[in-house]
From Swiss-Prot:
Name this polypeptide is given: Phosphoglycerate kinase
Subcellular location: Cytoplasm
Reactions listed under catalytic activity: (2R)-3-phosphoglycerate + ATP = (2R)-3-phospho-glyceroyl phosphate + ADP
Pfam families: PGK
Length: 400
């Protein structure tokens, strides 16, 4: 896989596919970025190209617009933050419409001097970006490619998507992987090749079905697989325990039984949970044994005994991969499981990887220093699919 050091970019236009998909708060007028982690992660690649006097054209998606412009998903606020981080102006090529690589983009790109940068409007405002129709994707890829002479893929959080800007544009331009993608791959290879032992994986999140592939892939490789979050209740049901009104995937119970039988004592479930009488921050709560959840109550976090037990396993591990919160951490009464696990992962002496997505958001929301972890991934879904052993379209396109 080529790197940007292999490209002769001085004086040339370089299209950089970054992942600037950040959360925005629209509640107080002008949109405000609430977590700029992905913007910051994109800077090293962009800066390296600017240092080589390239003309840099950054593109990204944000949110899930339906192939048409939606003002709330505009990348305009991201252009402002990117300019602050780079310390130079960022020319924004958005015109409020869906012609992402059209006249406005060509005008802005045409005015770039060496060492300057522009940002295109949200790629998903164009229906061709995510279209399942190969002709539509190819047509949009042609439009994007016409803006540049080189392509750099640096959107690790999107490499599992067969989207025009991710897997089609590299077929049309000399290309390389960006700094972020190479760093992410180095970390994931360390988790899959020969991880130092003991190797502990902590999985949370809502659904077993979302994590089934990675559970099956990791079970033979790990010394401990700790399961929390909403997905733990389907496992508890598989053991015959009542789960009240907790999140339950009934169709996955037999699968969970099989996984429990295969894993033996390597698959660790909570022994206590925090339950609530309703899904709300001000709900009545109680800590109960994991096999005694009352009828009508919802499990919304792992309990204090489970948090301590999970932390002990993590503290003794030489390699830790954590993906998914232990509870509804957005509500203070149900954040302690996630906080306890995050602090254990951060303070342990092992090689610690946070698998992106909600886990990375939790680290920042809970105020845990990011430098306390060996690596915080920018790609939740991409990380999981890589660990499953799947072929990721965006990586495959760069590796030719």
């Amino acid at each position: 896989m080529r790197t940007i050091d292999d490209l002769q970019v001085t004086g040339h236009r370089v299209l950089v596919r970054s992942d600037l998909n950040v959360p925005l708060d629209h509640s107080k007028g002008a949109p405000r970025i609430t977590d700029d982690g992905r913007v910051r992660a994109s800077v090293p690649t962009i800066q390296a190209l600017l240092d080589r006097n390239a003309k840099v054209i950054v593109c990204s998606h944000l949110g899930r617009p339906k192939g048409a412009p939606e003002e709330k998903y505009s990348l305009a606020p991201v252009a402002e933050r990117l300019a602050e981080l780079l310390g130079i102006p960022v020319a924004f090529a958005g015109d409020g419409g869906g012609d992402i690589a059209g006249d406005r983009a060509r005008e802005v790109v045409g005015q770039l001097a060496e060492g300057q940068v522009a940002l295109l409007e949200n790629l998903r405002f164009h229906p061709g970006e995510t279209s399942k129709d190969t002709v539509a994707r190819a047509t949009f890829a042609d439009e994007l490619s016409a803006l540049a002479e080189f392509y750099v893929g640096d959107a690790f959080g999107a490499v599992h998507r067969a989207h025009a800007s991710v897997s089609e544009v590299p077929k049309r331009l000399p290309h390389a992987a960006g700094r972020l993608v190479l760093t992410e791959l180095e970390v994931l290879r360390a988790l899959t090749a020969a991880p130092a032992r003991p190797y502990a994986v902590v999985l949370g999140g809502s659904k077993v079905s979302d994590k089934l592939g990675v559970i099956r892939a990791l079970l033979p490789k790990v010394d401990a697989l700790l399961v929390g979050g909403g997905m733990c209740f389907t496992f508890l049901a598989a053991l015959g325990h009542p789960v009240g009104a907790s999140l339950l995937e009934s169709e996955m119970i037999d699968t969970c039984k099989d996984l429990l039988a295969e894993a033996g004592d390597r698959l660790v479930l909570p022994t206590d949970v925090v339950v609530a009488d309703r899904f709300a921050a001000d709900a009545e709560t109680a800590v109960v044994a994991a096999d005694a959840i009352p009828d009508g109550w919802l499990g919304l976090d792992i309990g204090p005994a489970s948090t301590a037990a999970f932390a002990r396993v993590v503290a003794g591990a030489a390699t830790i991969f954590w993906n998914g919160p232990m509870g509804v951490f957005e509500f203070a009464p149900f954040a302690e499981g996630t906080r306890g696990v995050a602090e254990a992962v951060a303070s342990g002496g092992g090689f610690s990887v946070v698998g992106g997505g909600d886990s990375a958001a939790a680290v920042r929301i809970l105020g845990i220093p990011e430098d306390d972890f060996s690596h915080i991934s920018t790609g939740g879904g991409a990380s999981l699919e890589y660990l499953e052993g799947k072929t990721l379209p965006g990586l495959a396109a760069l590796d030719v």
